Amino acid sequence: MGKLVGAPKGHDRYRDPKTHQITPALYRVRAPFFWRNTIALFAVSSIPLAVYLYTFKKMGDDDLGDIPIPPISDEELQKLKLEYENQK
């Protein structure tokens, strides 16, 4: 196994060795890909956003009226209310 010392050759021209900030050369290298990457970001992020909005709309339209509620006696209801008040 070889030793790795320092940054790989050729990569030091893209960062300032003292401040480690991006140099104008790296901006020039990245420039052709900026708009393509931006469009890809919007395309990929629109899929989960569309799923979320569709689900939110469908759940908002549902009144849940078709779900049967089991009958409960008045005695049982009073017991549950008492338990609820005691838990507070």
UniProtKB/Swiss-Prot annotation:
PANTHER family for the chain: CYTOCHROME C OXIDASE ASSEMBLY FACTOR 3 HOMOLOG, MITOCHONDRIAL (PTHR15642:SF3), CYTOCHROME C OXIDASE ASSEMBLY FACTOR 3, MITOCHONDRIAL (PTHR15642)
Gene Ontology CC: one annotated term: mitochondrial inner membrane
Membrane-spanning residues: 33-55
Keyword Mitochondrion: yes
Recorded topology in the membrane: Single-pass membrane protein
Subcellular location: Mitochondrion inner membrane
Signal peptide segment: none
Record-linked InterPro entries: Coa3
GO biological process: mitochondrial cytochrome c oxidase assembly
UniProt topological domain (Mitochondrial intermembrane) ranges: 56-88
Subunit structure: Component of 250-400 kDa complexes called cytochrome oxidase assembly intermediates or COA complexes.
Keyword field contains Mitochondrion: yes
Gene (name only): COA3
Family, per entry: Belongs to the COA3 family.
Full protein name: Cytochrome c oxidase assembly factor 3, mitochondrial
Mitochondrial matrix topological domain residue ranges: 1-32
Domain of life: Eukaryota
Main location: mitochondrion
Keyword entries, A-Z: Membrane, Mitochondrion, Mitochondrion inner membrane, Transmembrane, Transmembrane helix
Function: Required for assembly of cytochrome c oxidase (complex IV).
